[in-house]
Structure formats: structure tokens, C-alpha cells
Amino acid sequence: MKLVRIPESKYYDYRIQAMFDCYKWDPQFCDSNTLSKYALILTKEENEEVIRLTKKLDNETRIAEKYLNQNIRIAKKLALPKKILEQIPKMQNYDDKKNIRLMRYDFHPDINKGWVVTEVNSDVPGGFAESSLLPELARKTINNSELEFISFGERMVEAINTKLNKKGTIMMVHCTCFSDDRQVMQYMGDRLKKEGYNIIYGAADHINFKEGQAYCILDNNKEKLDLIFRFTPLEWLIQMKPRRWDGYFNCMTCSCNHPIAIYAQSKRFPFVWNDLEKANISMETWRTMLPETIEVNEVGQKQGFIYKPVYGRVGERITIKEACKGDEYIKIINDVKRHPKQYLAQKRFDSLPLKGDDGKTYHVCLGSYTIEGEHAGYYARISEYPRIDSYAADIPVLIEK
């Protein structure tokens, strides 16, 4: 794995094209450029290894979530929000054959053991355009035809066509006030529109449910839906009023993702592995790849642990001290003390940085997608610090032939 520089003379045009042609509407976060000046190159062997590990992790995760859905007593250990726990009985009609299951596993190169996986983005993983259009733009800019890439968008289109056969209405459900959410949905919606689908963009509360079927309630679009493509996190969705959201949990309309995704989205997922293994469900790959994860109150005098929120996203509230800004670290520690059940402790691994030709070193998070159990491409980000957060830069992933 290595970094290859986007030629300095071409970077300005590359950035403009990323914004206007590749849906990269958030190229800046505060004072940080969030579009890397590099491409990440995987060897053929590295790509094959990550795909193999990703599929094994995904198989374990999907078997586990089905079991948890039938065993509420065990699922309670995940510290699911009360409103979601109340909905679990409604999810007993879940049929994986009628839905599309999308996940993304976060791989990190480790100095000592090759790869570690820190979590699975089980509910609403993003980065669709960055993992579909940006690699093609980078390859063209670098001018190296010996590099290839996997387009997430094309894999997703294939999965949806299998379910809907290029017919029907799809609602792209997202937080409509956020442009960075809209860019994810706009790319996927535009691509699906080319396949012949009727695409509607709306918020989670723009759907009503009748006898398990989803209907759009927007003016000029009041119709039955054939697919809900959701990018609103479940823990946000359940705060919405009026309370129409409970229809998502027993919905018979094809969904990507169905709320069953909440089980693995909880970072407390490792705390149910013993129960799963007692039911003869192997978590061998997860145990091998995830750093040691324990309850906050078990840390005591143990060294080398960091705290992570149970439902954190984009690296927020993780206590990697050198990556924290201002009094952020102290605030997180105080919050951990006040709300220990909202956090967990994870053994910090030794991230292997990659060196750029600017003399700086960069830490990598390689997000590996699955759709319906099959590998579906990469979404990667890099940072000068070993915490991949909102300040990190998106980087296209290319693969040596």
C-alpha cells in the first residue's frame, strides 16, 4: 500500500472536477482541505486479502444480527436506545431476501499485525460518490492505465436491479438540511435515474406507512414506494415528530438499510459475542481483527486504552489525545465519567503511517463495503493524526492489476 501524488500542476483542476463532476460538495472542513492530494494504491495481493477478510466479517455479522433480532434479552446488552428496544418485536417479520443489506468495515494498517478492524458502519455508511467517481478521476489525472478500481455505485445499482428489475419508485431518505448528506443521495439517485427508476428525495418523516407498505406524502409525489434508500441514522430518526417513524421497523417495503442494522452499529457489539458463541455462532474473524474492547469500568489501571462513544460517527469523541483540539480531550473524559454506559474502552493499536512525497506521514482508514454479502468497493480517508475524523481527507483507492 502506498500514496501516489496527484500532479501538483493538475491538482486545482482535479479538485474543481471533484466538486462539480463527482459530487464532492464538502471539499473543506473549517480550515482543512478534505480532498487529499494523493491516491491510495493497493497491491493486487492487499486487495484480495481485504476482500477475503471483509466477506468473512460480513458473514459473521449478518448471522449475528439475525440471532440478536430473535433474542431481545441478549440485544439489551448493546445499550440500544429505549425507543428502538420497544420496536424490536415489530422487526420479527424481517426477511433478508426482501431487503438490501449494505455495510462498510473500517480497516487500518497496523505496525504489528497487518490489518485491524475498528468497527462496522452497519446502519448508514456514506462515501458513495467518493468510492465510485473519484477513483476514475484520479486514475485519469495520474494517467496510469495499469491501475483499476471497484465502483461502489455500479455494485449498488446491480443489487437494486436484482430486487426491482429497473422498475418502480425509490425514495432517497436523508437529512435534507445537510448538503453533505444530500451529495451522497444525489449521486446515487442520479445514477439510479439513468436506470429508469422514479427518484424522490425527502426526509424520514416524508413517508407514511399503511399495512406495512411505505408511501411518500410529499406534494406531487404522493405514491407507493418500491424501495426506501435511507441515509438518516436510526438514533436520529427516532427523535422525529410526528411519530410516523415506527413504521420503518415493520415495513414490508424493500429497504436499504432495514433497521436490523442497529445491532452491529452499536460499538458494544463485542459484548454479545460470548452469547453468540454459546449459540454456535462463530465470531472468529471479528475476535482476530478487533482490538480488545471492554467496559469503561473495567479499565482501572490498565494502560493503552482509548474511549469511544457507543454511537459515535466520523471519529467524534474518541480520546486519542494528540488528535484532540483545545479542551476537547478534557471534555470527553468528563463525559465518560458522567455517562460510562454511553462509551466503551478499546485497546489502542499502533497505526502504520504512510509517507507522502511532501515529507509528511499519513494515517489511513480503508473502508471496505459489502452489499448483500459481496465486496463492493472502498471508501478511504487519511489524516496526519491517528484519528480519522471530520478533519481527515477523502482519498481515492486504486488497485494494481
Please give the residue ranges for each predicted region.
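Preference for protein termini
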Residues: 1-401
